[in-house]
């Protein structure tokens, strides 16, 4: 398999809900006029707490500082795994890279963020951790770094000088999980037809807000939550929304898989997770991979979110609760 280090240098930001009005103009520019901003990596995720933005340096320039905008200190690099065209199709999403990427990075104390889209899965690592990432994954992958749009092979360094060996160390923190009742769709859209849904998208993102709801907090079967994710990355659009919100959009423009599968969410974290802890994604992706369950995974500024097939949510909760009980004992 190949691991590509993409050219994007990404910043991760939290926009407080009361400050949304201040950023509507730059967000509309990033959403609908990417040629004007030259932004190639843009992701906006609405959660009950805030809006998480993942943007490259060009996109970051569009967002003026304010009391409403919180910026994570690190600059993040974007990794992407490509499988050979003839590879057997197994569970999709983060599950297929759980053993080969997520687990080894957790063992080497590398914190990761995940952004699954309709098209692929992006793994974000801090720029300062890149040498450890390359050293950790070089045995498993042919690694390429994009330079000027072209993949350049990264020399494999067989020496282990200066690199810590994988450690099991203290047990990871056991983070609570909840499963809101929403049923979600993972969709894409031909960028040429984006103007046709622009007014609906603006309405949903900026004007369709009920009063802020508490995050799902009633145990594994919590009520519905606000969640909407839009990404425009290298010209490809991906949208995650609940089935009720989808009804507002023209059905002939939004594309989904032929099965039209619906997904349920597992939300990870009782308190904001921060960016320093390692192994959070592995804590979820590992058990799902062992059970061969497909999952999309979206990290946000405060919490993580896994989307699993609707008909398997019961077994997913059981698998994860069993894992948590094992870690907590």
Curated annotation (Swiss-Prot):
Its main location: cytoplasm. Functions as an intracellular arginine sensor within the amino acid-sensing branch of the TORC1 signaling pathway. As a homodimer or a heterodimer with CASTOR2, binds and inhibits the GATOR subcomplex GATOR2 and thereby mTORC1. Binding of arginine to CASTOR1 allosterically disrupts the interaction of CASTOR1-containing dimers with GATOR2 which can in turn activate mTORC1 and the TORC1 signaling pathway. One of its GO terms (cellular component) is cytosol. The modification Phosphoserine is found at residue 14. The keyword Cell wall biogenesis/degradation does not apply. GO terms for molecular function: arginine binding; protein sequestering activity. GO terms for biological process: cellular response to L-arginine; negative regulation of TORC1 signaling. Phosphorylation at Ser-14 by AKT1, promoting the interaction between CASTOR1 and RNF167. L-arginine binds at residues 111-112, 274, 280-281, 300-304. PANTHER family: CHROMOSOME 1, WHOLE GENOME SHOTGUN SEQUENCE, CYTOSOLIC ARGININE SENSOR FOR MTORC1 SUBUNIT 1. Based on x-ray crystallography data, the protein would be constituted of 4 tandem ACT domains instead of the 2 predicted from the sequence. The keyword Iron does not apply. It comes from Bos taurus (Bovine). This is Cytosolic arginine sensor for mTORC1 subunit 1. Gene3D superfamilies: VC0802-like (3.30.2130.10). Keywords: Cytoplasm, Phosphoprotein, Ubl conjugation. Belongs to the GATS family. It is found in: Cytoplasm, Cytosol. It comes from the Eukaryota. The lineage of its organism: Eukaryota, Metazoa, Chordata, Craniata, Vertebrata. Forms homodimers and heterodimers with CASTOR2. Interacts with the GATOR2 complex which is composed of MIOS, SEC13, SEH1L, WDR24 and WDR59; the interaction is negatively regulated by arginine. Interacts with TM4SF5; the interaction is positively regulated by leucine and is negatively regulated by arginine. SUPFAM superfamilies: ACT-like.
């Amino acid at each position: 398999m190949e691991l590509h280090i993409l050219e994007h240098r990404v910043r991760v930001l939290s926009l407080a809900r009361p400050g949304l009005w201040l950023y509507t103009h730059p967000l509309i520019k990033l959403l609908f006029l990417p040629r004007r901003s030259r932004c190639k990596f843009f992701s906006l995720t609405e959660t009950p707490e805030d809006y998480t933005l993942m943007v490259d340096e060009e996109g970051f320039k569009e967002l003026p500082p304010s009391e409403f905008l919180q910026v994570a200190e690190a600059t993040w690099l974007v990794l992407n795994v490509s499988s050979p065209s003839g590879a057997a199709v197994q569970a999709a999403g983060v599950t297929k890279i759980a053993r080969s990427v997520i687990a080894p990075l957790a063992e080497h104390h590398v914190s990761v963020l995940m952004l699954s889209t309709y098209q692929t899965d992006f793994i974000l690592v801090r720029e300062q951790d890149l040498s450890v990432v390359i050293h950790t994954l070089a045995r498993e992958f042919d690694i390429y770094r994009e330079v000027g749009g072209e993949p350049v092979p990264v020399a494999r360094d067989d020496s282990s000088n200066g690199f810590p060996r994988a450690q099991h160390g203290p047990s990871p923190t056991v983070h609570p999980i909840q499963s809101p009742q929403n049923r979600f769709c993972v969709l894409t859209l031909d960028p040429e037809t984006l103007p046709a849904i622009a007014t609906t998208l603006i309405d949903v993102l900026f004007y369709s807000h009920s009063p802020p709801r508490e995050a799902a907090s009633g145990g594994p079967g919590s009520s519905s939550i606000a969640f909407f994710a839009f990404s425009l990355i290298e010209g490809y659009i991906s949208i995650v929304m609940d089935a009720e919100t989808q009804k507002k959009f023209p059905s002939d423009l939004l594309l989904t898989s032929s099965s039209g599968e619906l997904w349920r969410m597992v939300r990870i974290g009782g308190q904001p997770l921060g960016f320093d802890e390692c192994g959070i994604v592995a804590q979820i992706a590992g058990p799902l991979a062992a059970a061969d369950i497909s999952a999309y995974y979206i990290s946000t500024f405060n919490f993580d979110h896994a989307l699993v097939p609707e008909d398997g949510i019961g077994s997913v909760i059981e698998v994860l609760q069993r894992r948590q009980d094992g870690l907590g004992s």
